Amino acid sequence: MREPFQAILSSLAKVEARARAETSRGTCCVFLLASTIKVLAVASLLAFTLSCSSKPDPNTLVMIIESSPTNLDPRIGLDAQSERIDDLIFDDLLTRGNNLDVAPGLAERWDIPDPLTYIFHLHQGVKFHDGRPLTARDVKWTFDSLLQGKVRSAKAAVYRFVDRIDVADDYTVVFHLKEPFATLLWNLSDGAMGIVPYGSGDEVGRQPIGSGPFRFVSAEQDKDVVLARNDEYWGEKAHLSKVRFIVVPDTTTRALELRKGSADIAINALTSDMVLTLERDPNLAVMHAPGTVLAYLAFNLRDPILKNERVRQALAYAIDRRPLLEYLQRGFARPANSLLPPESWAYNGDVPAYDHDPARARQLLEQAGYPEVNGVRFHLTMKSSTEESTRLMAAVLQQQLRQVGIALDIRTFEFATFFSDVTHGLFQVYSLRWIGGNEDPDIFEYVFHSSKFPPNGANRGYFADPRVDALIDQARHELDRNTRKQLYAELQRTLADALPYINLWYFDNVLVHSKRVRNLTLNPSGNYDFLKTAELDGSRQSSVVSRQ
């Protein structure tokens, strides 16, 4: 059985290698052909598993994740798996709605008597998984242990504006700020900082005890994490008895696990081609909804060519996102015109758009002082990771920019090397994604404020504009929602003109699941909240709800 399996894998690798070579030379029709061949290869591979199906455990939902969480202490873990699994084990003071706004969590309500004082009133009767009651003392300890260095974590910087935390009574906790900070509530919500028991130290990372709908059972590095339902949960109880997260680093193997029935769910863990193939499986279903993860291009504004605003605008006009969305993303994405997703309360859709217009791009390049000489105006180098879809995207961008006289050289690196170069300013153009961080408008300070050049922030392109700095500073300290929204609207218009980024698209959240799983929901953040409502049905009949 092993020899045919390896033969298919070998054939698939050859198809991918040929497709990359052809795409770098050719056109979108070759790009489409390569994707079609890949779909057929994947389909052949998945068909091979027909005789290898597994019988699922009727009491355990098995979910595929790409890697192990780095640390399940909510004060420390920063990677996506840590934060998303933590959100099932722990409760935060606040939660987030589908409009990416805050809502009650452990705190049933809160008061802001002045810009420097936040008073949170906790639900009574909440218990940790070991039976201890959750009180204001636990909330104070969680943040004090972080701010006072008892636990060493990069998350401490998020709460640097907190001066002190007082316990007014068992169910009232008061945050005192050093200066007004409008984003505090966001930084106390969903997965940002789960509350740990009083006195907790570094043992939380190994044996987490929270108050959430699931309790920790076990974890083995690079293998799995197991959670069980918290039958004493204070809120709406989960339906699943047990959830097992299995670590499957290889994309093709993830598809095989779903096809065999040895896994029930994977979210945002498969290529678009694999999703389309699995959608034809009678035992599987696919659901997708708009997400917030942003793909973007960034420029080094210290570069003599790219510091010219007309050049950056010309690049935006030269790029045609349509074939990339259709053939690379297979329709599982939508165009982006802002760092913020449309679901955000601060999103401004009324900004200058850069629809594909090669003639306008050529005009701007002429105005910028770059005439064509033998068909080439100048060379640019784009750095990217070795991830497959990123390489294919770069090849198509190379072709599109060539049509306006820009020669784009592509350099791919393993992610650690690539990211090191990006953070040290060793690039002209690079492509990356924002995952989660762009859901709150305070991201603008981290990415575009002139005080946030690396290592102090993520302004990796060294963008500096006094107008942008002033708008960011004012919005961060303004507590009135309507005024903040107006400030962020103006900021997004200013950035759309200056164009330190080209925002490409927002990825959909795509969930592939066994039809024995029902009552699923999706939210824009792409977290694992759907496990809080999911049920296992022995009849394998699915009842799917897509919450948009």
Residues of each region from the PLM?
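Extracytoplasmic/peripheral linker and loop segments enriched in polar/acidic and small residues
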Residues: 119, 407-418, 446-515, 539
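N-terminal lobe/hinge region of extracytoplasmic solute-binding protein
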Residues: 65-114, 144, 207-211
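Long beta-strand-rich cores associated with HINT superfamily self-processing modules
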Residues: 511-540
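Ligand-site clamp/hinge motif
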Residues: 202, 231-276, 398-399, 407-409
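Append "and occasionally in soluble cytosolic enzymes with long acidic Gly/Pro-rich linkers
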Residues: 229, 306-399, 464, 471, ...
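Surface-exposed binding/hinge segments that line
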Residues: 111, 121, 155-197
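Gly/Pro-rich hinge or "lid" segments in bacterial periplasmic/extracellular proteins
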Residues: 101, 180-181, 186-238, 242, ...
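Ligand/substrate-recognition segments at binding pockets and active sites
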Residues: 52-55, 221, 368-436, 481
